Amino acid sequence: MRLIMNADDFGISKAINLGIIEGFKNGIVTSTTLMCNMETTEHAVNLAKENSKLGVGIHLVLTAGRPLSKNVKTLVDNEGNFLKYDKMVESACIEDIRIEFRNQFEKFLSFGIVPTHIDTHHHVHSIESVFEVVAELAKEHNIPIRHIKAIGEEKYENIKTTTEFIDSFYNLSMIEPQMLINLLDDNMNVDSLEIMCHPGYLDSKILSSSSYAYPRVKELETLTNKEVIQFINEKNIELINFKDI
């Protein structure tokens, strides 16, 4: 089995950025995805450049922070912040989404790095119209998209992706070391597997703005756990990133 352990939310805060790098240096994190509309995006970029073997994709955002684009009125509230998920689904115009996603992608490229792949914050590309915009970018740049089966396998025609994607490594009940070992053991026959994770340290930004806080620290502990690393080595699981699929 070839495993991509992808850490979402790179760029959301300095503490999260540093935690992701810890998971890469001393654990099994192989890949991350960068949020380009955050105050600490450039902090994450600098860390990525110092750790060039870490795969870095783009985490396209519609539901956190503020847009990079002007005049995308269907995406924002009265204060100029992105709408929450449900409101976004009701309000968002596809052309505004296209403008914003392209601006986020151009922002990523402006840092002088090439994204390994695309995924989205809160899996907004599981919405069919949003997926089409993401697919445009993926095809233009010949990069993979995170595999969301609910959108339909036919949507991934001519788009690179992993064989399987797992998002259940999440919440305290599911992120103990043995739970991750069991998850890996159950998928040993899969060719390429991406597991989503959210490791990190905590700071005031996360504590004040994220509903998912303490479990990030626990995830980091599990992703650097000696028993987990030993299991991966014993089972000859190949740790890769999206450049390898």
From Swiss-Prot:
Its cofactor is Mg(2+). It is an enzyme of class 3 (hydrolase). Mg(2+) binds at residues 59, 121. The keyword Zinc does not apply. CDD domains: YdjC_EF3048_like. It comes from the Bacteria. The keyword Magnesium applies. Its EC number is 3.5.1.-. Keywords: Carbohydrate metabolism, Hydrolase, Magnesium, Metal-binding. GO terms for biological process: polysaccharide catabolic process. GO terms for molecular function: deacetylase activity; hydrolase activity, acting on carbon-nitrogen (but not peptide) bonds, in linear amides; metal ion binding. Gene3D superfamilies: Glycoside hydrolase/deacetylase. It holds the Pfam family YdjC. PANTHER family: CARBOHYDRATE DEACETYLASE, YDJC DEACETYLASE FAMILY MEMBER. Belongs to the YdjC deacetylase family. Probably catalyzes the deacetylation of acetylated carbohydrates an important step in the degradation of oligosaccharides. HAMAP family: COD. Homodimer. This is Carbohydrate deacetylase. It comes from Clostridium beijerinckii (strain ATCC 51743 / NCIMB 8052).
